[in-house]
UniProtKB/Swiss-Prot annotation:
The keyword Protein biosynthesis does not apply. Gene3D superfamilies: 3.30.590.20. GO terms for cellular component: chloroplast. Disulfide bonds join C156-C376. Homodimer or monomer when oxidized or reduced, respectively. Its main location: plastid. NCBIfam families: glu_cys_lig_pln. It comes from Oryza sativa subsp. indica. Its EC number is 6.3.2.2. This is Glutamate--cysteine ligase A, chloroplastic. It catalyses: L-cysteine + L-glutamate + ATP = gamma-L-glutamyl-L-cysteine + ADP + phosphate + H(+).
């Protein structure tokens, strides 16, 4: 979804793989097993422990670069990490579920399916099981951050298992979950706020830097995939490809046409919202296409992105408007003399929200949330393009002469017109057909019989009708201009 604040293990994981590394909506979280699995065992307090922020030697810029470089790994160690978010609602009233209902679901999952609880100030705010976790977005959007897996079959099985578990617990409570990119019915004032102190900092800051940041926090859902790279050059090619093609993915997966009970004028309102959330930390990052781009250039960019907060002495310190560069030299007025740890750097990287994000892997962030088949299709689309050398080279060749102006045009227009967006002498649909074939070819060459996961994408492109346009058609015909039936149509 949006404010990326996923529950993350705040220490640097030794494998550095593309795990379902959480896009965090600005929240540093440590999950340190302290009790038995499931059955109400708590994983630990979610804020970073004091031990986690003890200083050894001051960080240098080289340390920050080395952190990103540590993500490089040989192809045989590449993994697929998939994340998705969904809206919980009361089946009888369609209203968004409140925190106490979410807490009961989390407790039910822990009790029945052997998850560890993640607790913050006596509130259960997430679950962890092995390398996968469940976390809450600011408005209670329910997120699965998947484990790093080898094949799309494993990824889809993980998604299906999660949806089965959530449905089993939720149905008994009269709660359903909706797979869509933007809350279709309820106003911002109707959305509950999760009991997480750090969100207050973001809620206060967002209106200062854009008009749609609160919508992003509370009313959007996404599906994304996190993928690995082998070297700086491999990272650069994948970053280029991901940014160039992100609007194409946005078109294919466009699924947020409603707002407060009626059409909103967009096929992907979720995507549009990111254009007026906080332009200091979002967008298409044109500097990535400069000849000088590499890990160090991304570090320079991130150093100047305004911070949200620092966690010290069991408190979140509001550092909005200050840069990590200030932090590096102990010049945060709100925390005088404090110097950052790698923990702080990792958490800062998760508060940057471009269409493709670099951490120790690359995150493809352009797709709306959707029903379960599309949760499997999104990672399949990108794996076929980025994990196959031949397809990656073909895409690099295809997009190498696209200008920054053309990429920005696609970013701006696709949320409105989807596959029908003009591009050069054709339309985005024409591009999508060619790109889909390259993705299929890439999956074929992987040899895991994964091409079937692209059926949903194939159906959208061959018909030329995005998921959002299909919903709009139902709204005008069968649903008799009511959005209420979407809660059943896109129910998990």
């Amino acid at each position: 979804m949006a404010v990326a604040s996923r529950l993350a293990v705040a220490r640097v994981a030794p494998d550095g793989g593309a795990a379902g590394r959480r896009r965090r909506r600005g929240r540093p979280v440590v999950a340190v097993p302290t009790a038995g699995r499931g059955r109400g065992g708590a994983v630990a307090a979610s804020p970073p422990t004091e031990e986690a922020v003890q200083m050894t030697e001051p960080l240098t810029k080289e340390d920050l670069v080395a952190y990103l470089v540590s993500g490089c790994k040989p192809k045989e160690n590449w993994r697929i990490g998939t994340e998705h978010e969904k809206f919980g609602f009361e089946v009888d009233t369609l209203r968004p579920i409140k925190y106490d209902q979410i807490r009961d679901i989390l407790n039910g999952l822990a009790e029945r399916f052997d998850w560890d609880k993640i607790v913050e100030e006596n509130n259960v705010i997430g679950l962890k099981q092995g390398k996968q976790s469940i976390s809450l977005e600011p408005g209670g959007q329910f997120e699965l951050s998947g484990a790093p897996l080898e094949t799309l079959h494993q990824t889809c099985a993980e998604v299906n298992s999660h949806l089965y578990q959530v449905k089993a617990v939720g149905e008994e409570m009269g709660i359903g979950f909706l797979g869509i990119g933007f809350q279709p019915k309820w106003a911002l004032s109707d959305i509950p706020i999760m009991p997480k102190g750090r969100y207050e900092i973001m809620r206060n800051y967002m209106p200062k830097v854009g008009s749609l940041g609160l919508d992003m926090m509370f009313r959007t859902c996404t599906v994304q995939v996190n993928l690995d790279f082998s070297s700086e050059q491999d990272m650069i090619r994948k970053f280029h490809t991901g940014l160039a093609l992100q609007p194409i993915a946005t078109a294919i997966f466009a699924n947020s046409p409603f707002k407060e009970g009626k059409p909103n004028g967009y096929l992907s309102l979720r995507s549009h919202i990111w254009t007026d959330t906080d332009n200091n930390r979002s967008g298409m990052l044109p500097f990535v296409f400069d000849d000088s781009f590499g890990f160090e250039r991304y570090v320079d960019y991130a150093l100047d992105v305004p911070m949200y907060f620092v966690y010290r002495n069991k408190k979140y310190i509001d550092c909005t408007g200050m840069s990590f560069r200030d932090f590096m030299v102990g010049k945060l007025p709100q925390a005088p003399g404090e110097l950052p740890t790698l923990n702080d750097w990792e958490n800062h990287l998760t508060t940057i929200f471009p269409e493709v994000r670099l951490k120790r892997y690359l995150e493809m962030r352009g797709a709306d949330g959707g029903p379960w088949r599309r949760l499997c299709a999104l990672p399949a689309f990108w794996v076929g393009l980025l994990y196959d050398e031949e397809s990656l080279q073909s895409i690099s060749d295809m997009t190498s002469d696209w200008t920054n102006e053309e990429r920005e045009m696609l970013r701006r227009k696709v949320p409105v017109t989807g596959l029908k967006t003009p591009f050069r002498d054709g339309y985005v649909r024409d591009l999508a057909e060619e790109i889909l074939q390259l993705s299929k070819n890439g999956l074929e060459r992987r040899g895991y019989k994964e091409v079937g996961f692209l059926r949903e994408v194939d159906a959208v492109i061959s018909s030329g009708v995005t998921p959002a346009e299909r919903l709009l058609n139902l709204y005008e015909t069968k649903w008799q201009r009511s959005v209420d039936p979407v809660f059943q149509e896109l129910l998990y």
